Amino acid sequence: MSNQHTLLMSNLLPVGSNISTWWNFGSMLLTCLMLQITTGFFLAIHYTANINLAFSSVIHITRDVPYGWIMQNLHAISASMFFICIYIHIARGLYYGLYLNKEVWLSGTALLITLMATAFFGYVLPWGQMSFWAATVITNLLTAIPYLGTMLTTWLWGGFSINDPTLTRFFALHFILPFAIMALSSIHIILLHNEGSNNPLGTNSDIDKIPFHPYHSYKDMLMFTSMITLLFITLSFSPDLLNYPENFSKANPLVTPQHIKPEWYFLFAYGILRSIPNKLGGALALLMSVMILTTVPFTHTSYTRSMMFRPLSQILFWTLMATFITITWTASKPVEPPFISISQTTSIFYFSFFITIPLLGWTENKIMMMNN
């Protein structure tokens, strides 16, 4: 048995001693997933996937089922927590150059897409006014696909409009996809431990490793406890903090809301979609807003893995973070000036990051060579 295997057996999992709190979000995501599956199971027991009964069944869960309000609110709030954690997890990966572990990064991107699909299907299930119209707008984008669009939309809807078959299949998909997320998470973790975690410096950790337990496991437990505390504070004092008032009304196909918007965690992609006044162009931009993450491992040009010692890249990274927040904010506003122009400008900035960062990598290489 090699020394590496002996080390693995004796220490369970050797990890770099200098990994920071930003490395705790993976375990927090796993906690969120377990929480979602558990609460989702209990909600599914009482939920009815029928357009005439779905809205009433959600009210029945919150009013009549013992502790049903806790299950329902916990499921909704921890979905938001899930996305907060995953966005921080992705930002950490971009900042510290973790995308260079290509298999892990690409499996993570697949996980993000599956999670977004799951959350979208779940948002439709209460059959509130915003649920119905968000589903109508987003699924209608499939019609932009040449030749196959109309057929795909009809197949997804189960008819010529969003109706009972649509809700049934959305419920089935929302139930089955978390298990796909579990499978993908397992692959993600296996691929990660094949090479091992990176560290903030972006250097090889082999010379300075410590056992994962108890050193890093206690750090994970601290973050886990903090997250659960925040979750229950929100649940107890502001359970409807992230809900839209429009969704407390039953879906009515005859009344269009003044401003259609999905949940806050989709607003960045929705803002990019809305900024392009063309259906096919908007649909492609929406798809690319997530798929562009897959290009990052192949466009890395810097000699240094992490952005920790690259001040120019740091400025660009924090510009991306500000852009992400601004797109989210503008997408929550009506389609009117000045929000249209702000949304279009920030969408250009968002995609510019992925084009500019390789060029900036080359520039930084030249500067370093000049200094040497």
Swiss-Prot record:
| GO MF term set | metal ion binding; ubiquinol-cytochrome-c reductase activity
Q: What is its main location?
A: mitochondrion
Q: Where in the cell is it found?
A: Mitochondrion inner membrane
Q: Which UniProt keywords apply?
A: Electron transport, Heme, Iron, Membrane, Metal-binding, Mitochondrion, Mitochondrion inner membrane, Respiratory chain, Transmembrane, Transmembrane helix, Transport, Ubiquinone
Binding residues annotated for a ubiquinone, in chain numbering: H193
Record-annotated residues binding heme b b566?
Answer: H89, H188
Q: What SUPFAM superfamilies would the database entry show?
A: a domain/subunit of cytochrome bc1 complex (Ubiquinol-cytochrome c reductase), Transmembrane di-heme cytochromes
Lipid bilayer topology: Multi-pass membrane protein
Domain of life where this protein originates: Eukaryota
Put simply, this protein is called Cytochrome b
Q: Lineage of the source organism?
A: Eukaryota, Metazoa, Chordata, Craniata, Vertebrata
Q: Name the gene that codes for it.
A: MT-CYB
